[in-house]
């Protein structure tokens, strides 16, 4: 028997229909799973917390869930009680009430464990981490192994061969002595890919204040191979968040009992919920340069 082949346009329509139906079924299944995940996040908030509801249209609603029904939830917000379909909610995040300032939600500082280059006394929590890139040529990554131990590292990306690249490791141990007082010890270890010798610094550091306004002081000793410097390097820095997305940062170094010029820096930190960009200038006291050397870094939190 001879079968008449389906015309090209008809085949295209049939294929398009199958694809559309398949995508619709996949989307429906994903939507159903997402709705089930959201339901597990729904609960009535206490007076010490607010809830940030991210809706599927990209908008954000901030308030407290006061009632949960089968298909809707009631949210107490700054404009009164609102009835919100559960199917329209993509995510619910519970935050402390003090994160609201002048009617805006201030997300937590995503880069509270560092100033520009120097570490603060704060630690990454277990499983948290970040990917960073300093001055374009120095990418790296750091992860919280536990709430009190983190490990980081990276490798240079100079426009040269592999044998001419540097690697670095940044182990760190620390914790909170009390609220708003955090201390840590750690090291920066630098080596060459083709060179077995290492240089670096071991340090102790303390941070005093909140993640949005803090002072950090540290002391470190440089080393080369197994030889440790007898003269420490002192660091004093701080961070002040001046708006929801902007902070001011400074990081300064001095070598006591030497003629070395102190190094000071100042700059801004641009913040998103998961990413920061630092733009700064570093200068040496007495160098005669009024502006300083530019410094830029990018940090993405995960």
PLM features: what roles do these ranges have?
Residues 1-5:
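Short, Lys/Arg-enriched N-terminal segments with co-localized hydrophobic residues
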Residues 7-17:
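Bacterial N-terminal signal peptides that target proteins for export
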Residues 15-26:
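Bacterial N-terminal signal peptides
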Residues 19-20, 30, 34:
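Cleavable N-terminal signal peptides
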Residues 32-133, 137:
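Compositionally biased alpha-helical segments
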Residues 74-75, 91, 151-153, 248-250, ...:
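Short hydrophobic/aromatic-rich beta-strand segments that constitute the beta-sheet cores
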Residues 137-158, 165-185, 199-217, 230-244, ...:
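Feature captures outer-membrane beta-barrel proteins of Gram-negative bacteria and organelles
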Residues 159-161, 177, 191-195, 212, ...:
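Gram-negative outer-membrane beta-barrel proteins
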């Amino acid at each position: 028997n001879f079968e008449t082949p389906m015309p090209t346009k008809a085949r295209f329509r049939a294929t398009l229909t199958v694809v559309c139906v398949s995508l619709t079924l996949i989307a429906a299944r994903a939507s159903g799973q997402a709705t089930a995940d959201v339901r597990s996040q729904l609960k009535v908030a206490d007076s010490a917390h607010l809830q940030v509801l991210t809706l599927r249209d990209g908008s954000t609603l901030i308030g407290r869930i006061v009632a949960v029904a089968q298909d809707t939830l009631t949210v107490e917000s700054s404009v009164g009680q609102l009835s919100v379909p559960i199917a329209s909610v993509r995510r619910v995040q519970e935050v402390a009430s003090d994160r609201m300032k002048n009617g805006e939600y201030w997300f937590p500082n995503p880069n509270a464990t560092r100033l520009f280059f120097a570490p603060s006394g704060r630690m990454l929590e277990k499983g948290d981490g970040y990917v960073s890139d300093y001055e374009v040529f120095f990418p790296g990554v750091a992860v919280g192994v536990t709430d009190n131990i983190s490990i980081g590292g990276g490798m240079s990306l100079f426009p040269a061969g592999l044998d001419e690249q540097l690697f670095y490791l940044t182990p760190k141990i620390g914790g909170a002595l009390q609220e708003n007082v955090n201390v840590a010890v750690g090291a920066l270890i630098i080596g060459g890919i083709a060179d077995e010798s290492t240089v670096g610094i071991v340090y102790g550091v303390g941070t005093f204040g909140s993640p949005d306004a803090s002072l950090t002081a540290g002391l470190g000793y440089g080393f080369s191979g197994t030889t440790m410097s007898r003269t420490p390097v002192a660091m004093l820095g701080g961070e002040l968040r001046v708006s929801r997305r902007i902070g001011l940062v400074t990081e300064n170094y001095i070598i006591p009992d030497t003629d070395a010029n102190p190094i000071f820096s100042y700059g801004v930190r641009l913040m998103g919920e998961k990413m920061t960009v630092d733009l700064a200038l570093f200068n040496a006291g007495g160098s005669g340069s009024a502006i300083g050397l530019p410094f830029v870094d990018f940090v993405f939190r995960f």
